[in-house]
Amino acid sequence: MKYKRNIKLDYLHTLVRNINFTQSFWLLFLLVVKDFSLFEVGLLEMVFHLTSLSMEVPTGVVADVFGRKISRLLGIFSYFVYIFIMLFSGNFTVILIGFIFCGLAFTFESGSGEALVYDSLKLMGEEDRFMKVNGMKEVIYQFAGAISLVASGYVISVSFNLAWYLTLGFYVVAMIVILLMKETPMLEKAKNLKLKELLYKQYVESTRIVFRNKRLLYLTIIGAMIAAPITTLYLYLPDHLDSLGYSYLEMGLLLGAHSAFAAIGGYYAHKLEKKYKEKKILYFIPLFMVISFWLVLIDDAIIIPFILLGFFDSIFYVVLGDYINRIVPSEIRATALSYGGLMFSLVMVIIFPFIGLIAQLNGLWTGYLILAIITSLFYLFLLKVLSGNHLDKI
């Protein structure tokens, strides 16, 4: 029962860490305050994802060997550095370094938080609750996002810098919450391994498990192919809405509505999966996402498909996370889960700057058109995987 507290503390951590007043307006901040071009912003995001790409697995090793708490704390300290650079530097090179720290912040958290929660449940014999717990975590995540998005529309209308200071304060609280968590004990054996054995166990064994297990590999690839286009659309949206004449407050309300519907999706994910099962979820939820991408191109109707994307994305995220965690052994969980972040970053490194360049030359509407085409091609790949029964367990 001592690990039960971890679940509640993780809910609290998810809340305070994601009351982030910069999450949807950092791009606008760089364009308006730092006077960067869309192409420069695309390069910065590419650096972020190159950092994620190169550091996902190493930071997963840190989590599995030295502790999931240690990894999460290192992530918060890295984000502190990123915030200070964004506040006090206008130099492109220095801000580029800041994005490296931002990438580190996400990779240290990626996999480690999920691994800590899943293994806490496993130690209590309640791992079957993970989808429900992860769904509730998604609700809290989106609720926090909705609060910060609605509020940030007002905050940045007062001062962009205020948004960074407020976010810094919530990250301090998040750090305290992590310190109160109890580490899972499966790490003790790993701590006693020699360096050579450790490297073999964490890199070679994790890689073998991910790439030899066809089901795990395809689920990881599919997750990246769905998440990257949605993230790209989301990050460029404030600039697109600005060009359509939306005020900062209206942007905040729209982004907040997106998060609110995402929270609903997270809450109902385990119920929908229980009713419709895996294949229907994997066939139809991504299909609805593809349709939403095409509807986003209609400027007068952009609100509805964007809000629905939040709903479908959360369902897919929660369900996919459960499918993947069922396969992965506890002792390499954070490392193996990091491959999902690695593949996501690989797709983002290509897509995000490419869409930024298209938008710079021909406008964001054209960029979104290309994004809709890319998403449709990804869905065709998913159909091929499903029709070939490549997700059958082995």
Go through each PLM region and give its residues.
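Helix-loop boundary and gating motifs at the non-cytosolic
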Residues: 2-54, 213-256
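Helix-to-loop junctions at the C-terminal end of transmembrane segments
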Residues: 54-67, 156, 264-278, 359-360
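C-terminal ends and interior cores of transmembrane alpha-helices
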Residues: 77-90, 287-299
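Helix-loop junctions on the cytosolic side of multi-pass membrane transporters
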Residues: 164-171, 175-194, 384-394
